[in-house]
Amino acid sequence: MKPIDYDKVQYKDYARGRAVNAEQLRVWVDAFAAVLPEGRPLDGLDLGSGTGRFTPALADAFGPVTGVEPSVRMREVALGGPPHPGVRYVAGAAEAIPLASGSVDYALMFLSWHHVPDKAAAVRELGRVLRPGGRLLLRGNFRDHHPRPWWLEHFPRGYEADAAIFQPLHEVVETFTSRGWRVHDFRTVTEPSGGTRAAMLGRLRLGTLSLFGQLSASEAEVGLARLEAAVAADPDSPSPTFAEPLLTLQVG
C-alpha cells in the first residue's frame, strides 16, 4: 500500500470521519472482553491509538491503558480530548514500543497493523511488552476475509484497491506463529449502524479511510459522485452493517 502520512491532512478530520458511537463502542468492548482474561484490572496497550477512539473505553472496561501513536498530530487530537485518569498517550511505534518488558496484559491494534512497515520487528516488540500469556487483539482486514461495506462498490477499483492494502489471514498468522505465538481466537463482529446513509456519505467525503490514499483523485471523485446519487434515493435509511474480523493471538 502507499504509505499515509497522518500528520499532513488526515489528522484534521479523522475523529469525525472515523467516529464510533456509544452503541458501537459497547459492541466492540464486549467482543474484546470475550477474548481477554477474566481478571480485572488488566494493563492495556492501544497500539496505533490515533485520536483515541477506543482508548478511554478500554480503560473504563478493563483497567489502565497506554495509547502509543507515531503521528504527532493524531496524538495531539487525542490529548486534546477529555482527560481520563486511566489513560495516557505517548509517542512510539509498533517497532519501538516505549514500555517496559512484560508490562501489559493485552494489546489492541484496531486497523493499524497494515500501517506497520517492519512487521517482524513489531512482533518482537509486542512479545517483549506483553506478559507471558498476554494477548494481541488484532482488528485488521485480511485480503481473503475482507468486509464488503455497501458503499465500496461505487468506487472504481474500490474492492480491489481496498483489499490490496491488507495481507491474507494466513500470512498474518504465520508472521506470529513462526515466532512462538499461537492463535487464541478468530471471529467476526458486526457493529451497529453508525447512522444514516447520508451521514456515512458525509464521513466518507472527509477522506480519512486508507482507501483514499490508494485511489487516484479522479477515482475518488467518481466514486463519491456515484455514491451521492445512490444515497439520494434513500438518504435517511440506516447505513447497512457488515461483519468485521477480529483475530486474537497469544504470546508464549
Language-model-detected regions and their locations in the chain:
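Short alpha-helix
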Residues: 165-179
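A short glycine-rich, Lys/Arg-flanked "PGG" loop and its adjoining helix->strand segment in the class I
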Residues: 120-132
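Class I SAM-dependent methyltransferase SAM/SAH-binding core
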Residues: 45-47, 51-96
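Conserved Class I S-adenosyl-L-methionine
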Residues: 21, 51, 182-252
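A conserved beta-strand element that flanks and buttresses the S-adenosyl-L-methionine
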Residues: 108
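Short catalytic micro-motifs in class I SAM-dependent methyltransferases
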Residues: 111-115
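Conserved class I S-adenosyl-L-methionine
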Residues: 1-42, 53-57, 74-77, 81, 135-164
